[in-house]
């Protein structure tokens, strides 16, 4: 992680994580 979320719970609600078939995990919505 490039930063530490002060409101980590809210970050989890905001971000959408998807695990791709090849094993990668991408997160969209909460990147800075």
Swiss-Prot record:
Function: Actins are highly conserved proteins that are involved in various types of cell motility and are ubiquitously expressed in all eukaryotic cells. Essential component of cell cytoskeleton; plays an important role in cytoplasmic streaming, cell shape determination, cell division, organelle movement and extension growth.
Protein name per the record: Actin-2
Keywords: ATP-binding, Cytoplasm, Cytoskeleton, Nucleotide-binding
Major localization class: cytoplasm
Entry GO CC: cytoplasm; cytoskeleton
Compartment(s): Cytoplasm, Cytoskeleton
Cleavable signal peptide: none
Family the UniProt entry places it in: Belongs to the actin family.
Record has Mitochondrion as a keyword: no
Gene Ontology molecular function terms on file: ATP binding
Keyword ATP-binding in record: yes
Disulphide bond pairs: none
